[in-house]
């Protein structure tokens, strides 16, 4: 990425956004009737689909059941056509396992698991197209799917990435910005309380700049919350209308 100007002198990024500006977000809930909950989201050109099953009885060994809360199971996969590599990823490869673990940690912090002891909640997320901010898109899609399933949560959990270029914090990184290799992080936030569900850093960032980049990600995550809240309200309204017919 040598010689590629990620931020112009006028403060514009390669795709025309300002430093703290989100990519366009579009989302729908209830896209799979067979699942207990489902959602589809587009964040820029990154597209993700999430389906949720549960709470239901523990599958497999009952010894896995937790006496005081639900077991949260998250699985991540990416379509073979999701990136320009066209590389077949075996199910359960390292990246998929790491992403599944990050998603589980995120949603264990957000779901009121104590309301459903000795049960299991399954969250499956697939990335259909990857163009930066993959983890964030997965979290935001899964949040809508969990809500669609009617599973109680402490709050929305909203995620966004951020990076640092030429002394400026950039929110919601595209693939080109991620590939440039600068410092970047991903943040999952419970916006009402400000609680951090997950914070993941991909490279070193000087402590003098950490607060600035973290605030850019948090501000962007709050912007995501505003948009997801509208999606939920619209979905509830549409469901109420269809029930009334």
UniProtKB/Swiss-Prot annotation:
Pfam families: RNase_PH (PF01138), RNase_PH_C (PF03725). Keywords: Acetylation, Cytoplasm, Exosome, Nucleus, RNA-binding, rRNA processing. The keyword Cytoplasm applies. Disulfide bonds: none annotated. InterPro entries: ExoRNase_PH_dom1, ExoRNase_PH_dom2, ExoRNase_PH_dom2_sf, PNPase/RNase_PH_dom_sf, Ribosomal_Su5_D2-typ_SF, RNase_PH. GO terms for cellular component: cytoplasmic exosome (RNase complex); cytosol; euchromatin; exosome (RNase complex); nuclear exosome (RNase complex); nucleolar exosome (RNase complex); nucleolus; nucleoplasm. One of its GO terms (biological process) is RNA processing. Belongs to the RNase PH family. Component of the RNA exosome core complex (Exo-9), composed of EXOSC1, EXOSC2, EXOSC3, EXOSC4, EXOSC5, EXOSC6, EXOSC7, EXOSC8 and EXOSC9; within the complex interacts with EXOSC2, EXOSC7 and EXOSC9. The catalytically inactive RNA exosome core complex (Exo-9) associates with the catalytic subunit EXOSC10/RRP6. Exo-9 may associate with DIS3 to form the nucleolar exosome complex, or DIS3L to form the cytoplasmic exosome complex. This is Exosome complex component RRP41.
